[in-house]
Amino acid sequence: MSEMTPREIVHELDSHIIGQDKAKRSVAIALRNRWRRMQLAPELRTEVTPKNILMIGPTGVGKTEIARRLAKLANAPFIKVEATKFTEVGYVGKEVESIIRDLTDVAIKMTHQQAVEKVKFRAEEHAEDRILDILLPPARDAWGNNEEGDNDSGTRQSFRKKLREGKLDDKEIEVDVAAPQVGVEIMAPPGMEEMTNQLQGMFQNLSGGNTTKKRKMKIVDALKALTEEEGAKLVNPEELKEQAIFNVENHGIVFIDEIDKICKGSNSHSGDVSREGVQRDLLPLVEGSTVSTKHGMVKTDHMLFITSGAFQMAKPSDLIPELQGRLPIRVELEALTANDFKRILTEPNASLTEQYIALLATENVKVEFTEDGISRIAESAFQVNETTENIGARRLHTVMERLMEEISYDASEKNGESLIVDAEYVSSRLGELVADEDLSRFIL
């Protein structure tokens, strides 16, 4: 798991997300508290439960982006789900317990990758030996047994050196690799994923276990395939499963987006009975319960839950009281201003303007955005958000695509030319659309 301090986490988030300091601080503290808890004595550790977070803010202000970036920083099992994908037990659709099953699968895969990475050097050596045995078969006696001899002779060492330098990469060899397991596609009703997984596992076991298959491939591809195969042999599956379940129980993070969509608004009179039921099904997970997965029983007592929603049609108080009580940290994200849009266009790593400059540079077209041009783009996006539907920073993608449409289309014929995107150019491309509310409603 990540050992970054809250200040380091916020600094990292700042390089991708503009503003929203309160939300960044909250998730940074929550992430650091995961590390702090693991430093405690075991008796006290079991008593410390995570403080779950509810992020409230209009669409397009950075809620989902914070989750995406946090997943990369956490170095822990992390899953992001949409609350609207789930239904109450008994209705057609996915049950909320599948969140924990999917998170456990993520943890198994992550732990396996880390374990294989630790033995990578040994696995590469074993893979090299197998390839060298194909290139330089050992001498055999009259009965077909390998003769004892100087197997690591000068010739073998010479070939090993060439192999490591990549001089043999394009040579083709026939190699025995593990045959892919035969997948059995089973169509099951929604909510029956666990039963489907068990049936698939049973059929795979019946199909003959570990079999090998001769394949002709380049040495560079063979080395990669054999390294993976040898790495898998060097890790203990039982230890790996045990470690993965420990990781998911103590470090797992669940991000639930669009939680406002499963609220029953105060003025709602629809017959959609399964909405509040989803909240009731979520409650045991957030409170702490034990979920059965194909890898074993997983406890959710110490998982961190981060939820978010726009809450335009409902209020946080429309959540059932028990769930509200389990989301003690409330963070309100602010709507973006024209100045925020200007910063979004230039400050983050791989900003939108950088992306367009790099894309068109592949066609040898030089694009330059001036200060006043960027200001005009930001003002245009902000104005359209104000007069039509406010979709936050996502409006910048629409505006930029419209602005760069002509040069993107003609770029292949304008090899070596330059384009300066200033306020005048932006006005000529977007002015009429921004001014006409009906046009901007449909086009921007």
Curated annotation (Swiss-Prot):
Pfam family, one: AAA_2
Annotated SUPFAM superfamilies: P-loop containing nucleoside triphosphate hydrolases
GO biological process, one term: proteolysis involved in protein catabolic process
Positions bound to ATP: I18, G60, V61, G62, K63, T64, E65, D257, E322, R394
Location within or outside the cell: Cytoplasm
Keywords on record: ATP-binding, Chaperone, Cytoplasm, Nucleotide-binding, Stress response
Sample GO molecular function, one term: proteasome-activating activity
Domain of life: Bacteria
Any one GO CC term of the record: HslUV protease complex
Region (Disordered): 141-161
CDD domains with a match to the protein in the record: RecA-like_HslU
Subunit structure: A double ring-shaped homohexamer of HslV is capped on each side by a ring-shaped HslU homohexamer. The assembly of the HslU/HslV complex is dependent on binding of ATP.
PANTHER family (UniProt xref): ATP-DEPENDENT CLP PROTEASE ATP-BINDING SUBUNIT CLPX-LIKE, MITOCHONDRIAL-RELATED, ATP-DEPENDENT PROTEASE ATPASE SUBUNIT HSLU
Family: Belongs to the ClpX chaperone family. HslU subfamily.
Its biological purpose: ATPase subunit of a proteasome-like degradation complex; this subunit has chaperone activity. The binding of ATP and its subsequent hydrolysis by HslU are essential for unfolding of protein substrates subsequently hydrolyzed by HslV. HslU recognizes the N-terminal part of its protein substrates and unfolds these before they are guided to HslV for hydrolysis.
Name of the protein in its database record: ATP-dependent protease ATPase subunit HslU
